[in-house]
Amino acid sequence: MSKLRVAIIFGGKSTEHQVSLQSAKNIINELDRTKFDLCLIGINEQGQWHEYAEDNYLINSDNPSTISLSQPLRPVAIIPGSTRQQFISLTDGQPLAQIDVVFPIVHGAYGEDGTLQGLLHMIDMPYVGPNIMSSAACMDKDITKRLLDDAGLAVAPFITLMAHQLNDISYNEVVEQLGLPLFIKPANLGSSVGISKVNNEAEFNAALSMAFEYDLKVIIESAIVGREIECAVLGNEEPEVSPCGEIVLNDAFYAYNTKYIDDDGAKVVVPADLDNAISLHIRQTALKAYQVLNCLGMSRVDVFLTEDNQVIINEINTLPGFTNISMYPKLWQSTGLDYQSLITKLIELALEHHKKTAVLKTKCEL
């Protein structure tokens, strides 16, 4: 049986560029080479696409704060069509070797928001993870919250503010509605980039200014006091949910540095120390959220568990990290599903979903 050729797309013009490089490194290292050949497509911080050699694609690969792309082989682009040869070398105009499936691990803007998924959909390419709509809906915290709330799932009380509305709302009005402390977040970023905890008016104004440097839409939400619990979900029509894991913080909140730089900022506990009934309730909530947002392939569902055992959904991450400290693979490893088998399963799910969509009609038969 011939091997499938997998393109790993990583990097990106995003605040999460370095996180993507860390995730890609682990996926590349763990890919089952008895089943898959490999093509590496890196996107630099200017948004340019290049093919990279496996033995020379990263610089400072073991340092999360300085990891970067190395010297590429050649620039590449995608052209319309559906022949599996849509990745073209811009050096000589020739197609790269046939690619059968893509594993996009571009975190954040342009990779997790439906943009890259739309491009791959246009060339009829199977890809790991959710479709365009699910990606976009889960990336936008405002839309995510509205859809979950409509489905009867609890979310933190929040206000959405657009950049042009900055002068239409006051600190006192927000505090009257949401209380203190608050969190202010760019609506369309991940990895806790641009997020601030607010306890007073000066912090409120500074937090809004910073958040609007990253996005034209901002979420202001009540701070929820509770344990931070995460579940991994895997599958298409019949998804499975992992045991619960817990983030135990030493810092004020789970910020970017806490996640990826500071080894002492937080501790990951798998499985979380929870009563069986509470654990089941959290897992059922994660599954419902996954299905409400029509997710495919994988997602990590993050919730707060309050003192009185309320489960409040924080966010749904459709392309969770695969870094050394990432919760998603750790949760599945706790069930006996090792890293390599998880990656293989995700690729199989991508091919399975594409096979079902490929037979759908694309023209009207009168």
Curated annotation (Swiss-Prot):
UniProt entry keywords in alphabetical sequence: ATP-binding, Cell shape, Cell wall biogenesis/degradation, Cytoplasm, Ligase, Magnesium, Manganese, Metal-binding, Nucleotide-binding, Peptidoglycan synthesis
Origin superkingdom: Bacteria
Reactions listed under catalytic activity: 2 D-alanine + ATP = D-alanyl-D-alanine + ADP + phosphate + H(+)
Pathway: Cell wall biogenesis; peptidoglycan biosynthesis
GO biological-process terms attached to the record: cell wall organization; peptidoglycan biosynthetic process; regulation of cell shape
Pfam family, one: Dala_Dala_lig_C
Cofactor note: Binds 2 magnesium or manganese ions per subunit.
Molecular function GO labels: ATP binding; D-alanine-D-alanine ligase activity; metal ion binding
EC id: 6.3.2.4
Residues that hold Mg(2+) 2 according to the record: 315, 317
ATP-grasp domain sequence ranges: 145-348
InterPro entries: ATP-grasp, ATP_grasp_subdomain_1, D-Ala_lig_Van_CS, D_ala_D_ala, Dala_Dala_lig_C, Dala_Dala_lig_N, PreATP-grasp_dom_sf
Compartment list: Cytoplasm
Gene Ontology CC terms: cytosol
Cofactor(s) annotated in UniProt: Mg(2+); Mn(2+)
SS bond list: none
UniProt keyword Ligase, yes or no: yes
Positions with a binding annotation for Mg(2+) 1: 302, 315
Protein residues bound to ATP: 175-230
Family indicated by similarity: Belongs to the D-alanine--D-alanine ligase family.
Entry function: Cell wall formation.
PANTHER family linked: D-ALANINE--D-ALANINE LIGASE, D-ALANINE--D-ALANINE LIGASE A
Family matches, as HAMAP family: Dala_Dala_lig (MF_00047)
Name of the protein in its database record: D-alanine--D-alanine ligase
Organism: Proteus mirabilis (strain HI4320)
